[in-house]
Amino acid sequence: LFIRHVKRSRLRHIIFLFLIPQRNAYAEQMEQAIGDDPRFRILYRLPRLEVEAAIMESDAVFLYSYQEQQPLSILEAMSCGVPWFAPDAGALSTLEGGIVLKNASPSALEKAVESLTDEKTRKLLGSKGRRQWEARFAPDAVNQEWEQLLFSSIRPEGKPPFASSIVREHLPTC
């Protein structure tokens, strides 16, 4: 659907890079839909560090899935300070640093992409996403939330529930 929308749009000066973990039937359908259109490139099986480098070198990250509840690709973009855009699915509307497409039409896609061609807009969104990632999704933030949750289960009278005293003793060394 995304490839068809781009092909119907007036977006001519933008290259869309697909980072695909494996070549499969869906990827082959994408290749057929792309044909010889020079606006699209597919990279398969990149090592983790190269995926991060590709994201950091991008102007924006796009997710065109309606089935993701909390997409890791968007969280990766946020961690790199790269703006993103995606259809309104799952928890995307609660994330900062991107544009949620309320309407999955070629014109909505074109408008979002065109807005992200502005460097000030990209920097503003990217920094908002990075701040939210650091506060809520970075490993230190997640560990702190888990620690608070685990320790909140200790009973007020000082009698810990089963295993919480073991967790308290060993958590700082984990």
Task: Put a short name on every predicted segment.
Residues I14-E28, Y44:
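Glycosyltransferase donor-sugar binding loop
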